[in-house]
Curated annotation (Swiss-Prot):
HAMAP family the record matches: Thymidylate_kinase
GO terms classed as biological process: dTDP biosynthetic process; dTTP biosynthetic process; dUDP biosynthetic process
Record gene name: tmk
Keyword Kinase found: yes
Record protein name field: Thymidylate kinase
Binding site for ATP: G10, P11, E12, G13, S14, G15, K16, T17
Keyword Kinase: yes
Family label: Belongs to the thymidylate kinase family.
MF terms in GO: ATP binding; dTMP kinase activity
The protein's enzyme class: transferase
Organism: Bacillus cereus (strain ATCC 10987 / NRS 248)
EC number(s) per entry: 2.7.4.9
Catalytic activity: dTMP + ATP = dTDP + ADP
Keywords of this entry: ATP-binding, Kinase, Nucleotide biosynthesis, Nucleotide-binding, Transferase
Length: 208
């Protein structure tokens, strides 16, 4: 792989999607080949899995089922979209990757980070990001943002109680500590314009 694989992580309402849309024009005007994608999703098979994972009525979904579905969506997305783009020297900006599974299923769902990491090592064949930006935000702030966003569809994970969302953040902070060589923590509780500027600087300092 010749390209650069940058993943954007964070709890619900941290601004990942908006951030990526703000990063795209900057790198495009610099004539950098850049592509944005998301997990779960990005391609037809993985988008179908996303629909299953996000259905509000599927509250009975068991934690291992959830973890395996995310890993399956990740595998197909990786081989069908991400790896080919990296081979063509793209900068790939991905909304979520393996660290989401570690924080959500490994820590918040209680499956254990090591177990979930091994599932995802198998799914990704140890393909890891060049750089990960973790957008840190208090769960209450993130969920309040979601509540104000009339255009955002509320999914099954959004509906979890505040205790779950606090555990997700705790999990992420452990992931940041565990993979400090590739993860940079950025405060997401700031104006989006400033957040975009800060993340651009991090990407350029670390990779370009």
């Amino acid at each position: 792989m010749k390209g650069l694989f940058v993943t954007i992580e964070g709890p619900e309402g941290s601004g990942k999607t908006t951030l990526i849309q703000g990063l795209l024009p900057y790198f495009e005007q610099k004539e950098q080949k850049v592509m944005a994608t998301r997990e779960p999703g990005g391609i037809a098979i993985s988008e179908d899995i996303r629909t299953i994972l996000h259905k509000q009525e599927y509250t009975m979904m068991e934690a291992r089922t959830e973890a395996l579905l995310y890993a399956a969506a990740r595998r197909q997305h990786l081989v069908e979209k991400v790896m080919p783009a990296l081979d063509e020297d793209y900068l790939v900006l991905c909304d979520r990757f393996i660290d989401s599974s570690l924080a959500y299923q490994g820590y918040a769902r209680g499956l254990g980070m090591d177990k979930v990491f091994e599932i995802n090592r198998f799914a990704t064949e140890d393909c890891m990001p060049s750089l990960t930006i973790y957008l840190d935000i208090e769960p209450e702030v993130g969920l309040a943002r979601i509540a104000k966003d009339a255009g955002r569809e509320v999914n099954r994970l959004d509906m979890e109680d505040i205790t779950f969302h606090k555990r997700v953040r705790e999990g992420y902070l452990q992931v940041v500590e565990r993979f400090s060589d590739r993860i940079v923590l950025v405060n997401a509780d700031q104006p989006m314009e400033k957040l975009i500027e800060e993340v651009i600087q991090v990407i350029e300092d670390k990779l370009l």
